[in-house]
Each structure stands twice: as C-alpha cells, then as structure tokens.
UniProtKB/Swiss-Prot annotation:
Residues 5-243 form the ABC transporter domain. It comes from Caldanaerobacter subterraneus subsp. tengcongensis (strain DSM 15242 / JCM 11007 / NBRC 100824 / MB4). Forms a stable energy-coupling factor (ECF) transporter complex composed of 2 membrane-embedded substrate-binding proteins (S component), 2 ATP-binding proteins (A component) and 2 transmembrane proteins (T component). It is a peripheral membrane protein. This is Energy-coupling factor transporter ATP-binding protein EcfA1. ATP-binding (A) component of a common energy-coupling factor (ECF) ABC-transporter complex. Unlike classic ABC transporters this ECF transporter provides the energy necessary to transport a number of different substrates. The keyword GTP-binding does not apply. GO terms for cellular component: ATP-binding cassette (ABC) transporter complex. The keyword Translocase applies. It is found in: Cell membrane. ATP binds at G42, H43, N44, G45, S46, G47, K48, S49.
C-alpha cells in the first residue's frame, strides 16, 4: 500500500528550553494513502493547522517524524522535493498571491523551480483550466472575488505538479458562494486528476464526501474513520465543541424521540430515501 504521508509519534511545541510551551501536538500517528480525500476537523486550538504545516516541512516535529513519500521532513536535503510533492494552500489567498496578473502568479512557483518557459506555459494553462479560472488569466488578482482568488492560489500549487495538496481552512474567509466554488474545485482535482487532498476545516459539510475524516482535540486524534463512522458519534463531537451536518443532527434528534432511524445518515438524499421507504 502506497502511503504518501506518514506521521509517526509526532509531538510539537512552539518553544523549547526554559520557556517551553505546552505541546500543540501529542503523539500523532497517521498514514495517508495516495489518491485519498482526507478531511481533518477540530475546533480552534485543536492542533489541526499545526499538523497541516508538518505535511510539507513548514514545521518540523519536536519529537517523532513525518515522512512524505518516505522522505524525512527533518532531512534538509529533501526539502524542495517534499514541498514539490505536498503543496500547502493557506487560509487567506492574499497571503499566497504574489504577482499583479493571474497568469504570472500561477507561473511564479514553476519559474522558481527553473522549469523551461514552454513547459511553464503548459502548466499554467493546465492549472488554470483545472480550477475553472483560465478565462481570468489576464486579470489582476485584486479584481477577483475571494473564492476566485483562492482558486488561483490552488492553481499556483497545481502548476508545481504536486501529488498531494494540503489546504489549511481554505474557505474560512469566504462567503457561501466562494466556499462552494473552492470545495467543488477540490473534489474535482481529487476525483478527476487523482491528486491526494488533505482538507483542514471547521465546516462539517465540507468533508461529508471525503474518503476519511480525522477529528482532533487538544493536539490528539480522537476519531478517525469514514464520514458515516465519524459523524454518527454525535455526542463525542458535541462534547469537544463540534457540530455535525444538519441532516445527521436531525437523525440524532429523531432517534432520541424513539424513531428508528439510522444514525449514520449524512445527506438530504439519504434522509428522503429512508422516509419514503
């Protein structure tokens, strides 16, 4: 089985020595298969964003190891290969966009890799078409909506030809329309392009279609399974301050009222199918 990322006994503190801070990550053990769509959820301060930054060596474990395609992130000679394998998209697209024109921004990463101009042009066209932004290639980024900017930021990562994209709360600053645009793009890249997607989010509905959902609390993994397996644990999720998808919450309340309804219903379609039986 091909694991694109492995975390072994990973713990992390932001400061050590005399002023050592409490651990933000505590003995994390995870393995991600190539081609999966993985959602990582948790409330603010759970450690999910800190963990995301370990997946492309932006942060290094205080204890334990992270491997990207068997390359140890602590080994400096692998740094560029790791970051080309696992691209990171940040919460605020304005922090990731560096050029005055969309096309130039997407070309920035490949140019830094020393890729020939003709290949860069092909990559830019491919990346912008993949996220549905090719028609905006000549636009200045400040003329775009928040969702469009985030799609350009994702295109900039795609142009590097990563095998995995890690997205750290990419929809947190977007309106509902922008969120739908970005999530639709992410799903398309995973299903049609085979890119491994690791989505960090606090919007439960965004990971309903994931292959796997990981729930974090206080720097630890507390749940790990398919969306159905995770979201049926309504009381566990509520105890750590998380909501569940609205349809799952409805099913949970109906069960409490004595109605025999499956606890793992996630979508409106599943609810309608059950009611119509």
């Amino acid at each position: 089985m091909a694991f694109i990322i492995r975390a072994q006994n990973v713990s992390f503190c932001y400061s050590e020595g005399e002023s050592k801070s409490p651990p933000v990550l505590k003995d994390i053990n995870l393995q991600f298969e190539k081609g999966q769509f993985i959602g990582i959820i948790g409330h603010n301060g759970s450690g999910k964003s800190t963990l995301a930054k370990h997946f492309n060596a932006l942060l290094l474990p205080t204890k334990g190891n992270v491997y990207v395609k068997d390359m140890d992130t602590k080994d400096a000679k692998h740094l560029w290969d790791i970051r080309q394998t696992a691209g990171l998209v940040f919460q605020n697209p304005d922090n990731q966009i560096v050029a005055a024109i969309v096309e130039e921004d997407v070309a920035f990463g490949p140019e830094n890799l020393g890729i020939p101009p003709e290949e860069i042009r092909k990559r830019v066209e491919y990346a912008l078409k993949a996220v549905g932004m090719w028609e905006y290639k000549d636009f200045p980024p400040h003329m775009l909506s928040g969702g469009q900017k985030q799609r350009v930021a994702i295109a900039g990562i795609i142009a590097m030809k990563p095998e995995c994209i890690v997205l750290d709360e990419p929809t947190a600053m977007l309106d509902p329309i922008g969120r739908r645009e970005v999530i639709s793009t992410i799903k398309k890249l995973n299903k049609e392009e085979g890119i491994t997607v690791i989505l960090i989010t606090h919007f439960m509905e965004e990971v309903v279609d994931a292959d796997r959902v990981i729930v974090m609390d206080d720097g630890k993994v507390v749940l790990d399974g398919t969306p159905k397996e995770v979201f049926k644990e309504v009381e566990v999720l509520k105890k750590i301050g998380l909501d569940v998808p609205q349809v799952t919450e409805l099913a949970h309340q109906l069960r409490k009222e004595g109605i025999d309804i499956p606890s793992d219903i996630l979508t409106i379609e599943e609810m309608v199918e059950f009611i119509c039986r």
